[in-house]
Amino acid sequence: RDRLSIGPVVFNEHLFYFKEILPDEKIRVSFELAALSKDGTFFEFEHNYYNEKGENLARCEMSGGWINLKSRKLTSLPNDILKKFQTSNKTSSFKEISSKDTRRWNREPRDLD
């Protein structure tokens, strides 16, 4: 990460719990790509949490982007990393997104008076 001077920034994250996860319970966490912009700047990931029986205990849906750690500005992914994401596991509803999709929740800051 430091070598490339890029890092992830999370825009939003939704966590849905289906069953209790105990502190000492062994779980498996999956990764699926739910969306990706053409140049890889923006992404949506889906993580599913499973117990040893394969029961889906929780799901995390998150969206974000990649920033240049020096300029602190959004940046596209290098081609070799972009290709890895493009060939990774995808959700059945995978889609290509743009910067407009990152604002779909229509949330605005509310400053203190």
PLM regions: where:
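HotDog/MaoC-like acyl-thioester-processing domains
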Residues: Y17, I21-K26, A34-L112
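Short, basic/aromatic beta-hairpin or loop at an interaction surface
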Residues: R1-P8
